[in-house]
From Swiss-Prot:
<keyword id="KW-0812">Transmembrane</keyword>
<dbReference type="GO" id="GO:0000917">
    <property type="term" value="P:division septum assembly"/>
</dbReference>
<comment type="subunit">
    <text>Interacts with FtsZ via their C-terminal domains.</text>
</comment>
<feature type="region of interest" description="Disordered">
    <location>
        <begin position="165"/>
        <end position="188"/>
    </location>
</feature>
<dbReference type="GO" id="GO:0032153">
    <property type="term" value="C:cell division site"/>
</dbReference>
<keyword id="KW-1133">Transmembrane helix</keyword>
<keyword id="KW-0472">Membrane</keyword>
<keyword id="KW-0997">Cell inner membrane</keyword>
<feature type="transmembrane region" description="Helical">
    <location>
        <begin position="7"/>
        <end position="27"/>
    </location>
</feature>
<dbReference type="Pfam" id="PF04354">
    <property type="entry name" value="ZipA_C"/>
</dbReference>
<protein>
    <recommendedName>
        <fullName>Cell division protein ZipA</fullName>
    </recommendedName>
</protein>
<comment type="similarity">
    <text>Belongs to the ZipA family.</text>
</comment>
<keyword id="KW-0132">Cell division</keyword>
<keyword id="KW-0131">Cell cycle</keyword>
<comment type="function">
    <text>Essential cell division protein that stabilizes the FtsZ protofilaments by cross-linking them and that serves as a cytoplasmic membrane anchor for the Z ring. Also required for the recruitment to the septal ring of downstream cell division proteins.</text>
</comment>
<dbReference type="InterPro" id="IPR011919">
    <property type="entry name" value="Cell_div_ZipA"/>
</dbReference>
<feature type="topological domain" description="Periplasmic">
    <location>
        <begin position="1"/>
        <end position="6"/>
    </location>
</feature>
Amino acid sequence: MENFQLVLLLIGVIAIIGVLVHGFWSIRKQQPKEYKQSPMADISRERRDAQGFDNDGIGAVRVVKNTQQDDEPETIDDEQRDPLATETVTDAFELSGTPATKVNKTRVEPSLIPQESVFATDMPVQESLFGADEISVAAPVITEQAVRTEPEPRLQPVFKPEPQLEPVELKPDPIVEPAPKQEQTEELGEPRDVLVLHVVAKEGEELSGAELLPCLLTLNFKFGEMNIFHRHEDNAGTGKVLFSMANMVKPGVFDPDNMEQFSTQGVVLFMTLPCYGEALMNFSIMLNSAHQIADDLGGVVLDGGRDEWLESTKQNYIQRIRAQA
C-alpha cells in the first residue's frame, strides 16, 4: 500500500511539473519579439553618437587651452582637477596616434545645451519608438450569446403506479423448545468398594460446628439427603453426588440450624466405587477437602482404619480406584 501511494505521488509531481513547463513555454511563445530584443541600448548608443549626449543629457567635456597655459603650465591639485575631464583627456591622448593640433589662444567657455532642449528633441523619438512597439491587446468581448446559458430542461417526475400487493398473512414459525437434557439415569449398581477418610480433632479437643459450617460452604458442600452434607458435580450444588460427609459420632447426622451449639470429635468423608464422573478426579477433590477441613479446624487426616495418612496409603487408594475402573 505504501509503494502504491509513493507511485501515485511521483506521477502527480511529474504531471504538475509538466503543466508548469508547458505554461511557461506557451507564454514565451506568445510573447512578441519586440519584448525579447530591447532596442533601447542601440537607440541610446546612436543618440549619443549623433548628438553627443547620453540619456541623462550630459555631453562630452571640451578642453580648451589658454596661451598662458602653453607658456607656463599651471599645476593643478588632484582635489581641484575634474575627474571627468581628466579621464576624457587621458583617453584622447591614449587613443590618438597623431599630435593634436593647436587650438586658438583665446579661452572659450564650454557651452552647455539646456536639458529641456535635449528632452524636447528626444521626445518625438521616444514617442515614435513606443508607438512602433506598442502592442494592442484586444480585450475579450463577451457577447450576449455567450452569456446566455441554455436552460436545463426540467425533468418531470414520472410516477409509475406500483402494483398493489395483496396482504399476505405471515404465520409465525412454531417455536421449538429445546428438549430438556436427560439426566444420566445409568444405574451404578451395588457399590463394590468405599473409600473413607476421617478428620478428627486432636486429643482432648473437639471440632466446633460454628467453624465447620462456613468451611463446608466454602468447599461447595450442600446439606441434603440423610441429613448429611454432599459434594455434587456442580459447585452450585446440582448434579450427581460425588462423595458425602457424615458425623463420626452416632447417629452420624447434622442439624444446620443448631451448628453453633454443635461439636463433635470428628467427621468422615466417603466415596463409593463405581461413581459418577472420573473416580480419580473425585478422590482428589475429597482428599483436598479433608486436608482443608483439618487445617481450618486444627484436626488430623486419617485413613479408613483411623490410621495416620501417609503417601503409601494414598497410593493404595489409587490402586483400589484403578481396580474398579
